[in-house]
């Protein structure tokens, strides 16, 4: 009992002594440290890059001041000389593996003694202690969710709460600079990239509402996989031309929502997708026509052939608009599609017979006052658009041959005479 009270008195006295020291005095208490001025902000990195590229740093106009409040560091978090570092702890707060064990070893036994008095911590919450032998003045302990590779909405909510609780606790204790490790990505099994999305999203939203309360947030990574992820995503979440207007914040919110789900898509890619137009597909060589268009085309070509033959001798070959040796003979109509079969050219006598029969039929129809007699041997080959009679409609139904040119019997007789 006496020993316990002595340890309690010791860590309390040590805490009071260290917190009352100035920075220069505290630097005598630890050997290695990385000061804040050695960790540039995103804004300072942009200016440094502009100088190396022979560009004027004054030309860089940053609308989103959050660039000045965010930094990226790869190394040991226990060496950062900031107001507070965040510890990815377990619920007992008594130390463990990973970054938790490193912080406890570097801070000395007084940290463990104070953590015993805190009574543990729930998932998503945070508690604060002194940094003791660390360059950091405070240690904020937070407990991340145990995902084991499978993320649920509760895991996302708990992880976001870790960052929110830590930042809130920092503002309550007048902490202006804070460094975060990658929470829950170790043995707790939270996937690295989705964890980075949650971290960046939550920190950005907090800084928007409390930009005057925090001077610098440092994302400290140790593994190469986390280094590559944060290196790529920091410029997406904290762009130099992000803007503070409502439209820009709305766009950031949509982007962050997608990134939090582990399926990031940058705004430039969205714009490219929106600008893509559907290009028309090239015409197929086997283009299909409707039955009406095919029938009209067949009649027009046949009429053209007949008009050409009117000024020529009967024995002279007719000019065929189709390829030599082919002629539309009949069309098989099936529904709305039609397939055309080639046929060898018929003798000129047969074509003349068709013309004479068509002329006789037309004269006969003009002279009759009653309903005209329709014969299967004749067909309107001039492509006229007159309304057919009921009898003609019945004959021109799909069950009959719509492109019939002449009676096969008469055609064979005329061919023999020739």
From Swiss-Prot:
Pfam families, sorted: Macro
Residue runs in coiled coils: none
GO cellular component terms, semicolon-separated: nucleoplasm; nucleus
Sequence ranges of Acidic residues compositional bias: 377-389
Positions annotated to bind substrate: 75-77, 88-90, 95-100, 183-189, 222
SUPFAM superfamilies to which the protein is assigned, alphabetical: Macro domain-like
Keywords, comma-separated and alphabetical: DNA damage, Hydrolase, Nucleus
InterPro entries linked to this entry: Macro_dom, Macro_dom-like
Segments forming domain Macro: 57-238
UniProt-listed PANTHER family: ADP-RIBOSE GLYCOHYDROLASE MACROD2 (PTHR11106:SF104), GANGLIOSIDE INDUCED DIFFERENTIATION ASSOCIATED PROTEIN 2-RELATED (PTHR11106)
Family in the record: Belongs to the MacroD-type family. MacroD1/2-like subfamily.
Function: Removes ADP-ribose from aspartate and glutamate residues in proteins bearing a single ADP-ribose moiety. Inactive towards proteins bearing poly-ADP-ribose. Deacetylates O-acetyl-ADP ribose, a signaling molecule generated by the deacetylation of acetylated lysine residues in histones and other proteins.
Name under which the protein is recorded: ADP-ribose glycohydrolase MACROD2
Organism expressing this protein natively: Xenopus laevis
């Amino acid at each position: 009992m006496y020993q316990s009270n002595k340890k309690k008195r010791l860590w309390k006295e040590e805490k009071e002594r260290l917190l009352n020291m100035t920075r220069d005095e505290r630097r005598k208490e630890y050997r290695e440290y990385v000061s804040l001025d050695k960790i540039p902000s995103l804004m300072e990195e942009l200016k440094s890059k502009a100088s190396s590229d022979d560009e004027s740093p004054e030309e860089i106009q940053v609308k989103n001041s959050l660039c000045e409040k965010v930094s990226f560091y790869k190394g040991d978090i226990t060496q950062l000389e900031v107001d507070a570092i965040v510890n990815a702890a377990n619920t007992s707060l008594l130390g463990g593996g990973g970054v938790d064990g490193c912080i406890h070893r570097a801070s000395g036994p007084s940290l463990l003694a104070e953590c015993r008095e805190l009574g543990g911590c729930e998932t998503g919450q945070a508690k604060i202690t002194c940094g003791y032998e660390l360059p950091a003045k405070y240690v904020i302990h937070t407990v991340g969710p145990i995902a084991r590779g499978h993320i649920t909405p509760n895991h996302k909510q708990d992880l976001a709460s870790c960052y929110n609780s830590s930042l809130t606790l920092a503002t309550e204790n007048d902490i202006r600079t804070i460094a975060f490790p990658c929470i829950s990505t170790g043995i707790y099994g939270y996937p690295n990239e989705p964890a980075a999305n949650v971290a960046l999203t939550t920190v950005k939203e907090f800084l928007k509402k409390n930009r005057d309360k925090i001077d610098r947030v440092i994302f400290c990574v140790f593994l190469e996989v986390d280094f590559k992820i944060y290196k790529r995503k920091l410029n997406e979440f904290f762009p130099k031309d992000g803007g503070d207007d409502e439209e820009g914040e709305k766009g950031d919110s949509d982007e962050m929502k997608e990134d939090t789900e582990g399926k990031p898509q940058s705004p430039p890619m969205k714009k490219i997708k929106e600008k893509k137009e559907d290009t028309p597909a090239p015409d197929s060589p086997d283009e299909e026509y409707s039955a009406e268009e095919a029938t009209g085309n067949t009649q027009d070509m046949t009429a053209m052939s007949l008009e050409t033959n009117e000024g020529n001798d009967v024995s002279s070959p007719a000019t065929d608009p189709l390829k030599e040796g082919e002629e539309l003979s009949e069309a098989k109509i099936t529904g709305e599609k039609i397939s055309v079969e080639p046929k060898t050219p018929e003798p000129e006598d047969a074509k003349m017979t068709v013309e004479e029969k068509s002329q006789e039929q037309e004269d006969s129809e003009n002279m009759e006052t009653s309903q005209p007699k329709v014969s299967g041997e004749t067909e309107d080959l001039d492509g006229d658009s007159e309304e057919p009679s009921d009898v003609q409609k019945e004959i021109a139904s799909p069950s009959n041959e719509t492109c019939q040119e002449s009676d096969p019997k008469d055609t064979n007789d005329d061919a023999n005479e020739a």
